[in-house]
Amino acid sequence: MKQNILKFNFKFKSNEFFVTEKNIFAFNFIKKWPDWQQTLVYLYGPEKCGKTTISQMWLEASKGIYLSSENFEEFFSDDLNIDYIKSNNWLIDNVDDLIKKDKELNSNRILNLINIIKDNRNAFLLMTGKKSPKYIDCDLNDLISRLLSSIVLE
């Protein structure tokens, strides 16, 4: 007997997300996009708290580009097209893990992306992490400063 595996392509709907006291502020803030006062947002919390789900809702609404630890390095291996960066919205998932993976190189890459987007009011960058920016182990003070100056949501 052979077991058949059925692949379903379920589309996530925001009304299926369980909103709690802990995540209601972040959930409501993300839903207000594109009416954000800043282009940089940092969303953090422990694993399984819903930050990936909330950020995926934003990614879909903003038609953004997802940068995970897998495709982050690939994206930066090519020459950066600044116009392309400025004309798209971006989600960097697990910033603290990226920095831990290659502290100096990835810190500089994240800072470059932040600087390009910060100077441009047409693109947004949502970043997620497990830790508050002030607790990220990073030697690049400019990056920590930029993360702390973004809108930080728990």
Label the predicted regions.
Residues 1-32, 37:
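A short, basic N-terminal segment
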Residues 37-55:
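Walker A/P-loop nucleotide-binding motif
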Residues 38-42, 63-66, 89-91, 124-126:
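Residue-level preference for the first positions of well-ordered beta-strands
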Residues 49, 71-74, 96-97, 131-135:
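Conserved nucleotide-binding/hydrolysis micro-motifs of P-loop NTPases
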Residues 59-89, 100-107:
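Short glycine-rich substrate-engagement loop in P-loop NTPases that contacts/grips substrate
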Residues 83-109, 113-116, 120-131:
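Conserved P-loop NTPase "ATPase switch" module shared by AAA+ and STAND
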Residues 133-148:
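Short regulatory helix/loop adjacent to the ATP-binding pocket of P-loop NTPases
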Residues 150-154:
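Conserved AAA+ ATPase "SRH/arginine-finger" region at the nucleotide-binding site
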